[in-house]
């Protein structure tokens, strides 16, 4: 129980460390101002904080009710730059040390994530409840180990709008810029199973395998699937900090199972069509600007199946600036025809 008199703290810092004093600092929060006091009206301790974490400003309110048999806590955090609100309600288990259960919710950019969880010692088990992402429902479950910190989550989405998702991710870009996702102390894995993709012409479903390991965000083993045409595989796909720049590199192989459907989708003229098993890309992007560098583009790259189809390197034939200027699906199909026309002249 706190004092009835309000305690104020200004211009301070909070260091979060693992219980072992030899461990590095996990989180550093700067406090602009805060107040701590006991509220007689609701018989609860109250804490209000204005501060920043990883250079992201936040407002935090904590209410601890001391009137009940089991201590209950209500937590509210507002992250201004992210336009996000985090709420958490949990009840401590007085019969078991370091154990409690609760419900958490995160609201951002028209999305709502609700979680039911249970913590026993260092293990947290969680499940979703009536959650939505860009107005589409989804579910998830997983575990979090608090020391050493590691999470493993599986998220199942029936539908996702790719355009809206990209817009939302652009708002969350500073999660990467401020070393939240790339924090070497926050390791874990999230697998996204997406049954249906909206707002994208070529692919129907996806599996995104996202790992964060030692300050690197790894997307290897992720796939995009076209049920009628083939599957795109991401290998050696990593986002990391290099010389204070956030660089994404990826090797991508699009295996084509139905050449006829592929060419029909892009409306490639019959005289320009070649025998095509796959398309291979190597790309690099600096997240601080809009520059994308295509390192390689190869048609019919030699892989395990040892296809006899001729490999064609398009790395010097493709102009990245021309690709950037494509505004819609119609322009993409027109540009693809131009490329396959040039390829037909090479054979």
Predicted regions and their residues:
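Membrane-proximal interfacial segments on either side of biological membranes
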Residues: 1-347
